[in-house]
Curated annotation (Swiss-Prot):
Keyword line: Disease variant, Mitochondrion, Primary mitochondrial disease, Ribonucleoprotein, Ribosomal protein
GO biological process: mitochondrial ribosome assembly; mitochondrial translation
UniProt GO cellular component terms: mitochondrial inner membrane; mitochondrial matrix; mitochondrial small ribosomal subunit; mitochondrion
Pfam families: Ribosomal_S2
Subcellular locations according to the entry: Mitochondrion
Protein name, per record: Small ribosomal subunit protein uS2m
UniProt keyword Ribonucleoprotein present: yes
Region entry Disordered, spans: 274-296
Gene assigned in the entry: MRPS2
Impact noted for substituting residue 114 to N: In COXPD36; results in impaired assembly of the small mitoribosomal subunit and impaired mitochondrial translation in patient cells
Subunit details: Component of the mitochondrial small ribosomal subunit (mt-SSU). Mature mammalian 55S mitochondrial ribosomes consist of a small (28S) and a large (39S) subunit. The 28S small subunit contains a 12S ribosomal RNA (12S mt-rRNA) and 30 different proteins. The 39S large subunit contains a 16S rRNA (16S mt-rRNA), a copy of mitochondrial valine transfer RNA (mt-tRNA(Val)), which plays an integral structural role, and 52 different proteins.
Gene Ontology MF term list: structural constituent of ribosome
Keyword Mitochondrion annotated: yes
Length: 296
């Protein structure tokens, strides 16, 4: 009995010291999360993980392709300074209605009416169209807003034709900031808001301009000489009263959105075709020297 009780501490390892090499190994080892293997998860689960990783890489390639080009959607060719002039985009309001933040965009004054610099308008309009096309390419929700009754029918038809949304009626304050309380927790806010008119009347800014700035929603807006461009992410100085100018804006935005959605379909089809021809290839998606922005 004494012998068994004396052997019991040796069996349990009481008083035993770990070798020094194991202590050094434990001190240098850094724990990291173990990656599940096929043996632990099974072949079906491992196949699902591989398919999800492949789909993620596929989507990343599609989304990153337009970022490799400065003008992937060729929006620069949609208009010219001459076309802006013919649509009377350069005509502003009287000098007495001028907003002080619009002075950098004014070329001069003629017969007490401000004249907008069309060179700056062309630059800002190209940036706005390019951003809108990128948003449509990434399947974002685009909302057109205007309070001008004269162009309500035109804007609603344009938004419907390009597969987007429009709001041309009275805009209730808090529809963006309190959207979860008004419409439920599953509501999705627009990814981009385009203001074809940023004023409710000649002096009152649209309520959605302020709410979009509070919710960090990017905005594109046509700002006349009596508008405040500070809260607009991509302001486009131009006439927002002439029917020719508003028709031009609608045509340009509709063309940019439609072209971006068509490019998305073409790029997806091209990558799927290349994936079928070269399975498992992680190289460049298109041959060196090929410019997809002009080939699609």
């Amino acid at each position: 009995m004494a012998t068994s009780s004396a052997a019991l501490p040796r069996i349990l390892g009481a008083g035993a010291r770990a070798p020094s090499r194991w202590l050094g190994f434990l001190g240098k080892a850094t724990p990291r999360p173990a990656r599940p293997s096929r043996r632990t998860l099974g072949s079906a689960t491992a196949l699902m993980i591989r398919e999800s990783e492949d789909s993620t890489d596929f989507n990343d390639k599609i989304l990153n392709e337009p970022l490799k080009h400065s003008d992937f959607f060729n929006v620069k060719e949609l208009f010219s300074v001459r076309s802006l002039f013919d649509a009377r985009v350069h005509l502003g309001h009287k000098a007495g209605c001028r907003h002080r933040f619009m002075e950098p965009y004014i070329f001069g004054s003629r017969l007490d009416h401000d004249i907008i610099d069309l060179e700056q308008t062309a630059t800002h309009l190209q940036l706005a169209l390019n951003f809108t096309a990128h948003m449509a390419y990434r399947k974002g929700i685009i909302l057109f807003i205007s309070r001008n009754r004269q162009f309500s029918y035109l804007i609603e038809n344009m938004a419907r034709d390009c597969g987007e949304y429009a709001h041309t009626r009275y805009f209730r304050g808090g529809m963006l900031t309190n959207a979860r309380l008004l419409f439920g927790p599953t509501v999705r806010l627009p990814d981009l808001i385009i203001f074809l008119h940023t004023l409710n009347n000649i002096f009152e800014p649209h309520v959605a301009v302020r709410d979009a700035a509070k919710m960090n929603i990017p905005t594109v807006g046509i700002v006349d000489t009596n508008c405040n461009p500070c809260l607009i992410t991509y302001p486009v100085p131009g006439n927002d009263d002439s029917p020719l100018a508003v028709h031009l804006y609608c045509r340009l935005f509709q063309t940019a959105i439609t072209r971006a959605k068509e490019k998305r379909q073409q790029v997806e089809a091209l990558y799927r075709l290349q994936g079928q021809k070269e399975p498992g290839d992680q190289g460049p998606a298109h041959p060196p020297g090929a410019d997809m922005s002009h080939s699609l």
